[in-house]
């Protein structure tokens, strides 16, 4: 069993994996101009042990607007900060191989995915390990019940069901598990038809437990019900790397040539706002005030944006 070092105070940013630029593709985006959001400079206060971000692949917020980041730093890969950027704690030293996404569920449990070891981990806010999905360095296929080969991201529904985007690798599926980690089903397979995937890289769930999948190399977001039935797709999203849903809005980052953040209507997929000039954005999260946090890989940064006008 893996031993976790004691938690160390720090803000948590979730960092993500970047493939080669040639593989990212380019899909121009038509979007709203004159963004309502502005960058907040120097928003975070680092502890002495870590003075800058590593590649930031995962970020999310809890019910108290504390920010958690998963980034590529051996000493403090998971860091937590309060809404003012003050360091709280950190944990995970020596535990991960290739940090990827981070999610906070409705109970404020912290989930992270490791694309290297092909595992996902659930922690409480103090850093105690509660659950593991997958087996370290054991690779599965699309039909596997307890192993992965493309562990990318996950989402948790209101009843605790876990949906894993197992797609950054040979696998091309969404796998569904019960809250205790018991396998339920999978769907997908490689292809371009509705319900098929070509790198399902990120996954999110809305208030009605509908599942949204960033089908990255197919340049679309697909929507499903909780049983995997295809509902709809959006193709106006560029190359979707990371998704986050809050209320009736979807926040999507395109980490390829567009290097942007999109704010979209969940009702019809319309683009309402666009933030450009990012550097390989991979993860995005939004707090209760509407502040947006974006984790960048090439930029090795976690950027904070606030709304300046309605």
Sequence positions of predicted segments:
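Positively charged n-region of N-terminal signal peptides that target proteins for export
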Residues: 1-5
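Bacterial N-terminal signal peptides
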Residues: 7-17
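Eukaryotic scaffold repeat domains enriched in small/polar residues
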Residues: 19-310
């Amino acid at each position: 069993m893996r031993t976790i070092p004691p938690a160390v105070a720090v803000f948590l940013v979730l960092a993500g994996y970047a493939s080669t630029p040639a593989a990212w593709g380019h899909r121009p985006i038509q979007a709203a101009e004159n963004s309502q959001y502005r960058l907040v400079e120097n928003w975070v206060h680092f502890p002495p042990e870590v003075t800058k971000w590593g590649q930031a692949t995962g970020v999310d917020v809890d019910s108290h607007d504390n920010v958690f980041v998963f980034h590529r730093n051996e000493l403090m890969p998971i860091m937590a900060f309060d809404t003012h950027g003050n360091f709280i704690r950190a944990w995970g030293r020596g535990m991960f191989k290739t940090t990827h996404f981070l999610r906070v569920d409705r109970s404020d449990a912290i989930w992270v995915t490791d694309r290297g070891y092909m595992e996902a981990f659930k922690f409480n806010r103090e850093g105690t390990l509660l659950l593991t999905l997958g087996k370290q360095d054991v690779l599965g296929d699309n039909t596997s019940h307890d192993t992965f080969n493309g562990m990318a991201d996950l989402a948790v529904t209101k009843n605790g069901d876990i949906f894993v985007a197992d797609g950054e690798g040979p696998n091309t599926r969404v796998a569904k598990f019960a809250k205790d980690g018991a396998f339920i089903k999978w769907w997908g397979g490689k292809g371009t038809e509705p319900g098929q995937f070509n790198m399902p890289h990120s996954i999110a769930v809305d208030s009605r437990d509908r599942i949204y999948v960033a089908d990255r190399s197919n340049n679309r977001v697909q929507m499903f019900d909780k049983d995997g039935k295809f509902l709809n797709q959006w193709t106006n999203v560029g190359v979707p790397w990371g998704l986050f849903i809050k209320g009736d809005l979807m926040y999507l980052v395109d980490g390829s040539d567009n290097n942007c953040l999109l704010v979209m209507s969940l009702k019809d997929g319309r683009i309402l706002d666009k933030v450009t000039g990012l550097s390989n954005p991979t993860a995005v999260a939004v707090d209760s005030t509407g502040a947006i946090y974006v984790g960048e890989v090439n930029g090795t940064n976690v950027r904070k944006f606030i709304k300046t006008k309605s």
